[in-house]
C-alpha cells in the first residue's frame, strides 16, 4: 500500500512509502521493520507496533526488561515496544510542553536522547527543545529535572546543574566513573555533571566568532576572545556588550590537543535539527559525532582529542559526501553523522543521516556500510539484505545483543538487523 506525501519542518515524510510487511528477523543480515506502519502520525497504543503510526522516531534504547524504548520525536513521547510486538505509551503528553517556570511534568518538547541509570530504575531524557535533562522514575512515574533551567543559553559551569543553562542538549551518557555527560549542541560544548550535582565544561568552547552580519568575525591573529560576564562560559571576538547575547559559533580545531581547547560544529538556532550523539567505550574514550563537520572524534581518558573517521574540514569548509567504504575511516567521507552505537567487538556504528545509510567503523579503523544504500533515499528492502534496503534520514542507531536497531526517521518506522 502506498501512503500519501506530507512535509513537516526539516523532513519530507511519508512520501509514497510502502507499508512494512512482516519478515523473519532471525535471518542474519536481513532488515525488518519492527514498529511503525510507515505513515507519519500518532496512533496504535496497546495494539500491534507494526500497525501504529509514529512521527519521526529519533532513537531507541533497550530497557533492562528487554523491551525497546522509542523516542517518538515529533509526537513528544517515549513509547515502548514490548516483547509481544505491541506498543505502549510511557511518558509525554503528546504536545509541546515544559515552559521555563513550570515544575517538572511529563511534557517534553522534541526529546532526542534516552538513557537508563545504572540501577535501571530511572529513564534519563534529553529534553532537547526544553533545554533540560529530566529523569523519569519507572516505579512511581515521577518526573524530575536533573539539569538545566530551561533557558536556551550558556551559563552555570562549576555551579549546581539545576541552575545552569543548556542550549539543545542532544545526547547523554554515563562516564565510567558515574558522571552524567551531556553534548550541549548549540553551545558547541560537552559538559558533565559530577556526583555532587555540579556541572562542568569537559570539552569544546563556546566562542562567538562567526562572520558578519551574524557575528563579529574571527579574532585577529594572536588576540584571544573576550570572556562574557560571569556566570556565562561564553567568549566573543568583538564587543561583549554587543555579541555576548549571540549564539555560540560552530568551528573546527584541536585534534591531538586538549579537549577544553577544541572546537566542534553542531547545528544551532531555531531551525536546527538534532545533532551529535555521544558514547563511552570500555576503555573510557568518549566518542562523539561532530555533525556539521562531518567527522567522528574521540576524547581519550587523558583528555586528548582524536579524529577517528571522516575527512577534516579544509579552510573551515566541511568535506561532507560519500566515499571510502573498504578503506581507512579517516579518508572516508560522511554526510551529517549523528548517532553512534558500539558493538561487542568494538565496531562503532554511525547513522550517516544525509547519506541515508548506517556505516561501521571497524576495530582496524576501516569503514563499511551495514544498512542502506548510501546516497539513495527511500523505503524498501524488508526481508532482504540490509545493504540493499533504502532508508530515509536514519537519525538513530543502537546495538544490543547482536541486533542493530535503526530509527528510520524520515520513514517514521523503527527497523532491526540481526548481525550476529
Give the label of every model feature segment.
Residues 12-30:
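Bacterial Sec-dependent N-terminal signal peptides
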Residues 25-56, 86-110, 140-170, 198-274, ...:
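Gly/Pro-rich loop segments of beta-rich domains
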Residues 62-65, 116-120, 174-177, 280-283, ...:
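Residue-level detector of Asp-centered blade-edge/turn motifs that repeat once per structural unit
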Residues 67, 86, 121-122, 179, ...:
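Generic structural signal for coil-to-beta-strand starts
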Residues 70-73, 125-128, 182-185, 280-281, ...:
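Conserved beta-strand positions in repeat-built beta-propeller and related beta-rich domains
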Residues 76-78, 131-133, 188-190, 294-296, ...:
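Structural signal for beta-propeller blades
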Residues 81-86, 137-141, 193-198, 299-304, ...:
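Short loop/turn segments that connect beta-strands within beta-propeller blades
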Residues 393-420:
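Blade-level signature of beta-propeller repeat domains, shared across WD40, Kelch, NHL, RCC1
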Amino acid at each position: 500500500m502506498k501512503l500519501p506525501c506530507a512535509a513537516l519542518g526539516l523532513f519530507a515524510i511519508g512520501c509514497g512509502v510502502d507499508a512494512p510487511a512482516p519478515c523473519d528477523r532471525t535471518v542474519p543480515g536481513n532488515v525488518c521493520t519492527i514498529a511503525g506502519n510507515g505513515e507519519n502520525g500518532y496512533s496504535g497504543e496497546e495494539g500491534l507496533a507494526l500497525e501504529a503510526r509514529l512521527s519521526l522516531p529519533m532513537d531507541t534504547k533497550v530497557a533492562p526488561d528487554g523491551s525497546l524504548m522509542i523516542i517518538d520525536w515529533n509526537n513528544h513521547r517515549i513509547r515502548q515496544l514490548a516483547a509481544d510486538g505491541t506498543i505502549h505509551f510511557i511518558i509525554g503528553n503528546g504536545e509541546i510542553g515544559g515552559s521555563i517556570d513550570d515544575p517538572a511534568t511529563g511534557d517534553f518538547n522534541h526529546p532526542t536522547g534516552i538513557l537508563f541509570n545504572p540501577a535501571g530504575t530511572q529513564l534519563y531524557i534529553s529534553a532537547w527543545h526544553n533545554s533540560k535533562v529530566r529523569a523519569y522514575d519507572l516505579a512511581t512515574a515521577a518526573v524530575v529535572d536533573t539539569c538545566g533551567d530551561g533557558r536556551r543559553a550558556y551559563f552555570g559551569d562549576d555551579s549546581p546543574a539545576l541552575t545552569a543553562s543548556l542550549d539543545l542538549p542532544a545526547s547523554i551518557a554515563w562516564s565510567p566513573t558515574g558522571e552524567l555527560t551531556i553534548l550541549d549542541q548549540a553551545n558547541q560544548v560537552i559538559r558533565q555533571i559530577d556526583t555532587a550535582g555540579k556541572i562542568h565544561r569537559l570539552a569544546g568552547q563556546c566562542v562567538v566568532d562567526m562572520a558578519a552580519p551574524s557575528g563579529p568575525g574571527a579574532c585577529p591573529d594572536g588576540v584571544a576572545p573576550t570572556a562574557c560576564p560571569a556566570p556565562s562560559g561564553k567568549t566573543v571576538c568583538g564587543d561583549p556588550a554587543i555579541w555576548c547575547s549571540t549564539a555560540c559559533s560552530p568551528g573546527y580545531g584541536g585534534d591531538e590537543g586538549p579537549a577544553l581547547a577544541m572546537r566542534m560544529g553542531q547545528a544551532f538556532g531555531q531551525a536546527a535539527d538534532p545533532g551529535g550523539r555521544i558514547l563511552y567505550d570500555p576503555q573510557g574514550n568518549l566518542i562523539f559525532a561532530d555533525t556539521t563537520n562531518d567527522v567522528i572524534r574521540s576524547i581519550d581518558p587523558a583528555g586528548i582529542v582524536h579524529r577517528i573517521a571522516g575527512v577534516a574540514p579544509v579552510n573551515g569548509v566541511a568535506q561532507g559526501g560519500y566515499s571510502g567504504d573498504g578503506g581507512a575511516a579517516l579518508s572516508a567521507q560522511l554526510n551529517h553523522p549523528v548517532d553512534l552505537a558500539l558493538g561487542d567487538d568494538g565496531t562503532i556504528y554511525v547513522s550517516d543521516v544525509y547519506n541515508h545509510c548506517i556505516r561501521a567503523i571497524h576495530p582496524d579503523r576501516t569503514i563499511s556500510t551495514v544498512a542502506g544504500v548510501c546516497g539513495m533515499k527511500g523505503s524498501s528492502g524488508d526481508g532482504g539484505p540490509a545493504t540493499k534496503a533504502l532508508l530515509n534520514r536514519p537519525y538513530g542507531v543502537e546495538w544490543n545483543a547482536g541486533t542493530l536497531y535503526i530509527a528510520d526517521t524520515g520513514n517514521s518506522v523503527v527497523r532491526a538487523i540481526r548481525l550476529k
